[in-house]
Structure formats: structure tokens, C-alpha cells
């Protein structure tokens, strides 16, 4: 299970649009399935919304693990702690935009090889 929390958005609509873009991204889903805290894929999902944000203010966390802040990789990453976190059944992706007071939480699922294989082999 993936829980995406968008915080400090300019509007409720902006928060919702970005949250769903992250939760529905096949690249984010496969990264989570592979236990990879790939913050670049999160940033890509934000960017494809074409929402006007300040990329130099964005902070991305997996759980409480800061992976990106001020538009670049965080110097505070604890790889061991982050890798352990990514083994959890529920992964929380927190994005702080620092643009306003609005927030949105959405849920999604990962995308595993097993899921793809089952559905690729399925015939109706």
C-alpha cells in the first residue's frame, strides 16, 4: 500500500492533482515494489502535472526519511534506515511544497512483476 501525503499546497486542487499523479505513476509504483526510494520518480510525477511549484522548496520524504530538500538530494539521508523503511507493507510518500496551507492524502498500490505476469497471461 502506498499513502501519498501532499502538504503545504497552494490549493486543494493542486494538492489533489499532485497526489494522484504520484500515486498513479507506474514508475513510482515499480520503485516502491522494488523497495527503492527513488525520489526522482516522485519529482517526475509532480512535474508531469504542470502545476506551478518552486522546485527549490520541495521536500520529499519516504516515511520520516528525508530524501530530497530544496530541489536536490538530501545530505541527511540515512541509507540503512531508508532501506529498512522501504521493506514495510505500507509506504508513505510525503511531499512538502511550502506554497500554502492545503493538503491531500491519497492511497495507491505498488506494481510488482508478479502482478504484471498474472495479468499479461490472463485471457478472457
Each language-model region and where it sits:
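Short glycine-rich or small-residue beta-strand-to-loop segments that form or flank ligand, phosphate
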Residues: 1-8
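Internal helix-turn-beta structural module
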Residues: 8, 13-124
